[in-house]
Structures are given as C-alpha cells and as structure tokens.
Amino acid sequence: MSVSANISVEAPIESQIQEIAYDGTEIYQLPPTLSEHLAKCAAKIDFSKTVNDLDLVKQSIKKEDEKKDDDSKDAAAHFQSSLWPWDSVRNKLKDAFTEVCVLSDVLAIAKEKRFMVLDPIPQEPPEVKQMVQVYARKKALASAANILLTGAERLKTAHTDQGGNRSAPDFHIELLRLRRNWRLKKVSNTIIGDLSYRTAGSKFMHPGMFEVTKAEDEDNNDENASAAAGTIATTGTAPEPKLTSLKVNVPTELQGVAFIKVITQKDQGDLCTATLNMMGSTQLFPQAGEWQKTLDFAQNVLFCKELFNQLAREAVQLQAPIPHVVVGNQIRATLLPGIQLVISLCHSTSSDSNNSSEPIKDHDHVLEHSLHQLLREFHHKNTHHPFPHPASAPLGPSKKRMLAGPSAFDRYELLEMTKSQTLLEQIIAQAQHIFTRRRAQYVLDTLAREVKDPQITSHWNAMNSPTMSCVKINITSHGYDANLRTSLVIHVKERSLKCICRDGRIMHMSYEMQELRDLILYQISQHQIVCLQSLAKCMAWQILSNSSHLGIGSVEPLGNASSCVLASPNSDRLIAVQVRCDPQLDVKVYIAQSPGKDFFPGSLVQGRHWEHLGGHFKELRFDKMEGKNFHNKMEFLMASLTSQT
C-alpha cells in the first residue's frame, strides 16, 4: 500500500496581465482583497443543490431507520448503527440559515416598498350628467348671491338710519381731515391751529393762530340758511347746503380776502400789472367743508402781509438815487425816468367784494411767479445754512467763502461774494427788465411792419432768466437769401442792451429805444450795400468804391449814408447807389456813361482819350423801376446796362 502525500495547491503569486501597451509594457491586475475573495467564493455556492442533497439525506435516513427497526427486532439489541457525526451541527446551521433568509426578506420588504404594492381593482366609472352639475352650481351661486344681497340691504338700511339721525358729519372725522392739512395742538380743553410759515423759515411776528370748536346745530342751521339765501340771490338756484360739524375762528386781522397788486405806471397809465394771491387752493380738497376755504383765505392774508411788510422794511432801508416812498399800504419805487413801480396791499373784509376775481387784461404771470419764488427763497435761506468745514469752523459763511483763503481770492472777489440783493431790489430789477423787453419788442415789431424790404425776423429765446432775455434778428432779402443773411443777437437786460454782430463787434446801448432803432436801420443799410456787392460779383460787375459812412451831402442827425460805385464789365457804364436811413430808408441810384457824348475837343483838351473819364451822373426814378425789391431792381438795371460787345 502506497503512502499518501499531502499536496498544497495555491494560487500563483504572479498577478494576471490586464493590458499590454504598444511599447510592450505589461499592466497587471491587482490581486483581490479578502472581502472580494470571500464574495467570489460565496458566489460559487449553489444553495438550491444543497437543499436537494438535504432531502436525499433525510430520505436515506428514514430508510435506514426503518431498516434498523427491522434489524433490531431480528438482531441483537446491543448493536446500534451510527449516524453522520456532524448531522446535528448541520441541522442547526440549516435552521439558522432559514431564519436569516426570512429576516432578510422581511427587511427587504420593509425597506423597499416595491415588494408590496396594493393595486385597487378598477371599477367602471359612473355616468356623469353635465346638466345636473350645471343646475347644482347654479343653485349654489343663487344661494350665495341671496346671502350677499341680504347683507347689503341690512348695511344700507343701517347707514340710512344713521344718516337720518345725524344731520352733520361726525366731529372727529372732520377734525381728522383738518389735521391732515393743518398743524393742530391741544391746549387744555381748546384745539389751537397754526397758519404761519414759521416751519418753512418765516420770521414774521404775527402768531397766525386759529381756534377749532364744535359747531352747534343752531349755528349750522343759521349758516346754511344764510348761505342758501345768498346763493339764491346771486345765481337764482338753490343748491344743497354743505353741513359741517367744525367751526373755525380766525383772528379779525386775518379775515377777508387780501392780495398784492404790482403796477408799472407811466404818466398815470398802467403798463404792466401783476396780482399776487393764493386763491383756488380749496379745489385740491373737494371733501373739505367751509372751514377749508376760511383757513385758505386767512393764510393768504398772512402771506400777503408778510411779503408787504418785508418789502416795506427794505424800501425804507435802501438808499436809492430817487428814494422809495412808503405810504400806508403802498410802496412807490422809480424804475426808469418817468416810470414808477407801485406795490399795493389790498385787504377787503367784506364777502361781497369781487375785485380780486375780475380778470386783468395785462396781467404778468412771470412777475407773479417771481413774487412767490422770492419769498420762498427768503424762507429757505433762513432755515438752510451751509455746513461748516471743518466741523470746528463757525456756522454761517458759505462754502465759497470758506475756500477764499486756499483759493487766494483778491479783495474784489471777496467784495462780490458779500453782495446780495434784497427782495425789493430783485423785484425792481425784474420790473425794469420786463419794461425794457416790452419796449424792445415794440421797436422790433414796428420796424418789421414799416420796412418791407428787406425782411426783418425776430426769434426770442424761450429759456430766459428773470433779468435777461435774448433775441436773434435776421435781415434777409426775398429771393436773395443765398447771397447774404445779416444776423445779430441782442441781450436785453434791466437798464441796458447788448448787441453782438455777426463779425464779432459788440455794442452797448442804454434803455433808450431810439438807439436800438438807429442800430437796426444802420444794419439794414449795410445789408443792402453788401448784398448789392455780392450780386454785382455774380454779374461780373466791378466794385470801384465802397463806403459805410459817406462824408458828402447833407449832414444826417442819425448817421451818415452808405454808398458804393459799380462799373460794367466793359467799363462803359457806372452805377452809384446811396442808401440813407433818416428818418426812414431812402435809396437813390445814379448812372453815368463812358465815353461821354457831350465831349468836344478844344484847344486845351485835344486828345480823344479824355472822353473815357465818364460823363455826369444822372439820377433814376428808383420807385418807377421794374422789380419786386431793391436787389431785383438792381439786377434788372445791371442786366440792361451790360453791353453785348
């Protein structure tokens, strides 16, 4: 008998080759870990085969048991066949494996719901009748509408009963509306209001207080009856009186209607009028009662009194060449010689005065807006002071004045920074500018209407300052716009005019409009001469001489005439043109012929070449010549005098 030998079978140490690169490098596969090796071995076990083997073992065991029983009966009892020694261990492992499988299934079912899905058994859908649904919804909407209508009727009935029991609006509601627009405070048992502009920066000494009380029924009835009677007397109809539960008591000096009237007079005739008031503010609050109108009128009176008081104080303090006069409620200041500015405070306590409501024909809205704006700026300066820089600097100097040291301002610049205009000085300056501008407009319109040739057009700048306006004047000839267009710009200031011509010349004029008229007439004469020279060049005529100020002839009080002398292309014809502007434009045209027909040689002058000096000039009747305007006539004249040879 051969002796058995133990042979160990092990996996090769060398790993398997996973990939061979192009350069021959071999990439090996890493050896599996213990867990991977265990999983690989477990995957090779066939548990179903194991179960079948167990069944076969059980059947064989049963057969052996039966055979043993038979043998025990026949054979001796002291002998017993032995079973497989690991049978009990195997059975316990099998039971444990079964329990683990059951536990795994239970955990899988509990964790993943897909193992147990309850699918309901589909049933046939019931037949839906659409008309039944429509009737059901209609019935539900009808019941809801009935509930809402019933509630609305109840609210309407309650409101009607409440309105019938109360003749006037609630006092607290009216007080709330009053508090939205006016400052109120409670002093003891009294409600006091404030009409002044102190919160806006006003320093007027009048307190401007009013008292708010609760109106009694008898007072309401009396006021409504008187208001209705007055309305019937004026209009003939009886509107419904507006009831109120508030009563406003204003001081006596603030009752009524007040406005400031500014008039520019010349020889007791009004040139310009502006009225300052704040009426019409009650239209912004349609729900307000009679108290709103009363408070608006009272605040307007306070505003006008404050403005007039400030103007009167400045009129007394200013040192003008012609002193301002303050008499009663009237301030008189001199704008220009013979022209005065009258500022009046009109205050009427009677309710039937309609002077303020009458329309004014020559009302200047710009001046009215300026009066409002100037007082608002005065209030703004009282409350808004420039911040000091640095923080330790004194409060008061402006930022520009603080930079005077680092910027090295001189004495003149420092004096200019300290200058400021008062309200009255600004109003006087604006009134002077308005008067000067109107006179300039009148002069330009008059010249444009009187002078038909050439045409004068004025374009006023829409964006102007209150003390300076700008107008551009264009002088053109109809049909000859391409030859020449004379343009000049005039700056209208308070007491002077500044003219800037096209060639850059600047001329300063006073407020006398005769200087402006003379300047425009001079520009017209220059335009005619320069445009004629341009036309002569186009027609090949020669310009022999040109003079802007002709020094011969009669002396003119408003300036000398302009002239030019033209020669034909063959130099056989001469044209002399003279344009005068006193008192209106006057054009004279003279012609001469060369050689002269009246030349006769004598003993002293024997050469025939002396006849080309030209003959005497003859004046033409310019008004009888054919043509639409001056340049058209001159074009026809030069064309007819041009020789063909």
Curated annotation (Swiss-Prot):
Q: Name one GO cellular component term.
A: core mediator complex
Q: Does the keyword Transcription regulation apply?
A: yes
Q: Which GO terms describe its molecular function?
A: transcription coregulator activity
Q: Which GO terms describe its biological process?
A: regulation of transcription by RNA polymerase II
Q: Which UniProt keywords apply?
A: Activator, Nucleus, Transcription, Transcription regulation
InterPro entries (alphabetical): Mediator_Med17
One Pfam match, given by its short name, reads Med17
Q: Where in the cell is it found?
A: Nucleus
Self-association state and partner proteins as the record states: Component of the Mediator complex.
Belongs to which family? Belongs to the Mediator complex subunit 17 family.
Q: What does this protein do?
A: Component of the Mediator complex, a coactivator involved in the regulated transcription of nearly all RNA polymerase II-dependent genes. Mediator functions as a bridge to convey information from gene-specific regulatory proteins to the basal RNA polymerase II transcription machinery. Mediator is recruited to promoters by direct interactions with regulatory proteins and serves as a scaffold for the assembly of a functional preinitiation complex with RNA polymerase II and the general transcription factors.
Record-given protein name: Mediator of RNA polymerase II transcription subunit 17
Q: What is the lineage of its organism?
A: Eukaryota, Metazoa, Ecdysozoa, Arthropoda, Hexapoda
